[in-house]
Swiss-Prot record:
Organism lineage string: Bacteria, Pseudomonadati, Pseudomonadota, Gammaproteobacteria, Enterobacterales
CDD domains: Alkanesulfonate_monoxygenase (cd01094)
SUPFAM superfamilies for the chain: Bacterial luciferase-like
Protein family per UniProt: Belongs to the SsuD family.
The protein's name: Alkanesulfonate monooxygenase
Statement: the UniProt record of this protein carries the keyword Cytoplasm: no
Enzyme class: oxidoreductase
């Protein structure tokens, strides 16, 4: 099975060390463009662009990278409760059209009550997933070309429609990750690819089996992906030294503050990440070559595969054997590590190299009539 390898655009900061300003670098458009172009040249399928108040806006960043890349896809966040599904569908179709079919979407419900309140969202965990399920139904139906009437608990639309369809049919793929039962049910019923953070393979296997069974109950099959950091070097010793160096400027106070911030979230996945290290520096290798040091201060994905190219490839293939076909990777700093992964890891894997999309046929289009419909030729009698 060929593997889809993604990279990451660090719109919330980058550098040589975690938890410190030392060794950091400016995150401007030029730097992000360098990373995107490196990923494009090296054969990554796409890049994940993060979302939230600590990041630059993912949609604007993605749009700005379209003209400077050729085949790279952009995995950007859909935010139920923050954005209406009709507006999100228009945005999704436009990004897909402008990128010539290079848009992918990641459903993000949110987990930090403080950040959600700042965005005007006061729903609890269960309510957010209810709203996300309704959002996704409307969003998908619009992209399928339907005129939508929907009267749900959280979302109400009447006569909603999309005048400009996406390039990808029936619609651009929808990714999603969540560890709670309600999240897995949403994934099973509505998404195309279920993402998990990089837990030990036996825990990932349990997740996949649960989601696969839930999807089968809905008569569906879905794909699977994993989100991991990577520290790959020419030798295993060099890789582990690089891992230790990454947290060498990290003090206990910063770790404690980070763990306190994570504790206030209602994310089951974040709780599972924190339980892998319990905020302690010792015993960070939680599974062969799987290191939890990143999660001491980084929210979300907090584990890294560490080793030389063949060793890391063997661990990736262990995940692939569970049914995972997509790997969303990152490393610090992201420009240099994109090359290291491409040069030291990719030769040991069956990597699916994306093709450059062909131009779409030019279809003449008149101005929308009364902001309501696109004029079509009428057959002459």
């Amino acid at each position: 099975m060929s593997l889809n390898m993604f990279w990451f655009l660090p719109t919330h900061g980058d550098g040589h060390y975690l938890g410190t300003e030392e060794g950091s670098r400016p995150i401007d458009h030029g730097y992000l463009q360098q990373i995107a172009q490196a990923a494009d040249r090296l054969g990554y399928t796409g890049v994940l662009i993060p979302t939230g108040r600590s990041c630059e806006d993912a949609w604007l960043v993605a749009a700005s990278m379209i003209p400077v890349t050729q085949r790279l896809k952009f995995l950007v966040a859909l935010r139920p409760s923050v954005t209406s599904p009709t507006v999100a569908a228009r945005q999704a179709a436009t990004l897909d059209r402008l990128s010539n079919g290079r848009a992918l979407f990641n459903l993000v419900t949110g987990s930090d009550p403080q950040e959600l309140a700042g965005d005007g969202v006061f729903l609890d965990h269960s309510e957010r997933y209810e709203a996300s399920a309704e959002f996704t139904q409307v969003w998908r139906r619009l992209l399928l070309g339907e005129t939508v009437d929907f009267n749900g608990k959280h979302i109400h639309v009447r006569g909603a429609k999309l005048l400009f369809p996406p390039i990808q049919q029936p619609y651009p793929p929808l990714y999603f990750g969540g560890s709670s039962d309600v999240a897995q049910e949403l994934a099973a019923e509505q998404v195309d690819l279920y993402l998990t953070w990089g837990e030990p393979p036996e825990l990932v296997k349990e997740k996949i089996e649960h989601v696969r069974a839930k999807a089968a109950a809905h008569g569906r099959k879905i794909r699977f992906g994993v989100r991991l950091h990577v520290i790959v070097r020419e030798t295993n010793d060099e890789a582990w030294q690089a891992a230790e160096r990454l947290i060498s400027r990290l003090d206990d106070e910063t770790i404690a503050k980070a763990q306190a911030a994570f504790a206030r979230t209602d994310s089951v996945g974040q709780q599972r990440m924190a339980a892998l290290h319990n905020g302690k520096r010792d015993n960070l290798e939680i599974s062969p070559n799987l290191w939890a040091g990143v999660g001491l201060v980084r929210g979300g994905a907090g584990t890294a595969l560490v080793g030389d190219g063949p060793t890391v490839a063997a661990r990736i293939n262990e995940y692939a054997a569970l049914g995972i076909d997509s790997f969303v990777l990152s490393g610090y700093p992201h420009l240099e590590e994109a090359y290291r992964v491409g040069e030291l890891l990719f030769p040991h894997l069956d990597v699916a190299i994306p093709e450059i999309p062909q131009p779409q046929p030019l279809n003449p289009q008149g101005e929308a009539v009364a902001n309501d419909f696109i004029p079509r030729n009428v057959a002459q009698s």
